[in-house]
Amino acid sequence: LSPACPRVTDDALARRLLAAVPTLARHSCVNDVGPTFGCVIASTSLPHVFEHLVIDAQVRACASFTDITFVGTTEWLDERAGLARVEVNFADDLIALRAVNDALAYLNGEVVA
């Protein structure tokens, strides 16, 4: 993340995210608040949002792959520096690459001034 970017979402960003990608709220998510990503979307790290955007894009692009479950993890490596590790599985490398690029473009458009 750029030094100027926020590290955590807020209510306004959460509303914009859910307006653009309503299915994010229903993603399963291991967290301390509840069973879905919607429980934490208004106060979670931007890398965590990125993880779920990538997963969501892959689910939509791979709708014909009915036996695949997409999972991911996110951890800060250095929050002050904006460095995080985000890992997601994938079924198709080109679809995954597109999902990563689209998620980055979307987040940059939302948070980079």
Residue ranges and their predicted role:
Residues V88-V112:
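M16/insulysin-pitrilysin zinc metalloprotease superfamily fold
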Residues S28, V112-A113:
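Basic polyanion-binding and macromolecular-assembly surfaces
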Residues L18-I95:
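M16/MPP (pitrilysin/insulinase) zinc-metallopeptidase core fold and M16-derived inactive scaffolds
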Residues L1-R26:
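Active-site-proximal helix-loop elements at catalytic-domain edges
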